[in-house]
UniProtKB/Swiss-Prot annotation:
This is ATP synthase gamma chain. GO terms for molecular function: ATP binding; proton-transporting ATP synthase activity, rotational mechanism. It comes from Synechococcus sp. (strain RCC307). Belongs to the ATPase gamma chain family. InterPro entries: ATP_synth_F1_ATPase_gsu, ATP_synth_F1_gsu, ATP_synth_F1_gsu_CS. Its main location: membrane. Pfam families: ATP-synt (PF00231). It is found in: Cellular thylakoid membrane. Produces ATP from ADP in the presence of a proton gradient across the membrane. The gamma chain is believed to be important in regulating ATPase activity and the flow of protons through the CF(0) complex. F-type ATPases have 2 components, CF(1) - the catalytic core - and CF(0) - the membrane proton channel. CF(1) has five subunits: alpha(3), beta(3), gamma(1), delta(1), epsilon(1). CF(0) has three main subunits: a, b and c. One of its GO terms (cellular component) is proton-transporting ATP synthase complex.
Length: 315
């Protein structure tokens, strides 16, 4: 059994570690609430933009519009946009995206496509850089609570590659926020934009709520939103001109939403991981305290036996 000093040092170390993990859990919980505020502030613009596009879609055949972002090509070159965080200590959040990206990359290569990556986040960038994957652009050091400026950087790079002919299709791989204890890596086609996917019934928005002192999440369908545009609304510009302006905004908004969901997932994963670490540290400290008490009791008993033995020898 370890001596008393070693056990005391371990107990002190575990308790100090628990203070750190508990502080990180509280910070993550606070940032999750701030992530909610970002989503709520950006939602009115996103909703209005989707309704304008929906109104245009109902008046013209978007498939026949001469708009580059809508033009589907015979894909030969495909770009994967993978989103992780810049830091660790968030459970399997980063590893799950890296694994899914590797699998998708291998699937596409096996099917004969030329595949490249755009990385968002230091973890995914470092991983694939070290393994010499073809990376055409990388974004690190973005705000932990993503803004439209962050999304614009990514969407501009994606749009430039697509319009320049460097890629025929862009797929986005990120973590979908389900609730505070559950997230899911998902992938979706980002470009070419699908006009039928605008304001689809499956499009969900999430809102963080507090109920009975516990932080939770509510999801609602975008199709349930009210305030539709009036059917007699007149657009002065031609449909093609409007689409050339609005579709890049829609692309940026799609990227922003993915960044925000990914950030919320990272914060929730970190909060859960640090909560588990704090619980484990508490249990370990309790176990070490029991070991310390046993060792101390054994030492006292041994001293008593030595005293008794010495007294018996002198008698």
């Amino acid at each position: 059994m370890a001596n008393l000093k070693e056990i005391r040092d371990r107990i002190k170390s575990v308790k100090n570690t628990r203070k750190i993990t508990e502080a990180m859990r509280l910070v993550a919980a606070a940032k999750v609430r701030r992530a909610q505020d970002l989503v709520l502030r950006s939602r009115p613009f996103a909703d209005r933009l989707a309704r304008v596009l929906e109104s245009l879609q109902s008046r013209i055949a978007l498939e026949s519009a001469d708009t580059p972002l809508l033009q589907a090509r015979d894909p030969r070159h495909i770009t994967l946009v993978a989103m992780t965080g810049d830091r660790g200590l968030c459970g399997g959040f980063n590893a799950n995206i890296i694994k899914r990206t590797e699998q998708r990359f291998a699937e596409l290569k096996a099917s004969g496509y030329e595949v490249a990556l755009i990385t968002v986040g230091r973890k995914v960038d470092t991983y694939f850089q070290n393994r010499n994957y073809p990376i055409t652009a990388s974004f690190t050091g973005l705000d932990q609570l993503p803004t439209s400026t962050d999304a614009l950087q990514v969407s501009d790079a994606v749009q430039a590659e697509f319009l320049g002919g460097a890629t025929d299709r862009v797929e986005l791989i990120y973590t979908k926020f389900i609730n505070l204890v559950s997230t899911k890596p998902v992938s979706q086609t980002l470009l070419p934009l699908d006009p039928q996917g605008i304001a689809s019934p499956d499009d969900e928005i999430f809102r963080f709520v507090t109920k009975e002192g516990e932080l939770g999440v509510e999801r609602s369908s975008a199709s349930n939103q009210e305030d539709k545009l009036k059917s007699d609304l007149v657009f002065e510009q031609s449909p093609s001109q409007l689409l050339d302006v609005l579709l890049p905004l829609y692309l940026q908004n799609q990227v922003l939403r993915s960044l925000q969901e990914s950030a919320a997932s990272e914060l929730a994963s970190r909060m859960t991981a640090m909560n588990n670490a704090s619980d484990n540290a508490k249990a370990l400290a309790k176990e070490l305290t029991l070991d310390y008490n046993k060792a101390r009791q054994a030492a006292i008993t041994q001293e008593i036996l030595e005293v008794v033995g010495g007294a018996s020898a002198m008698a």
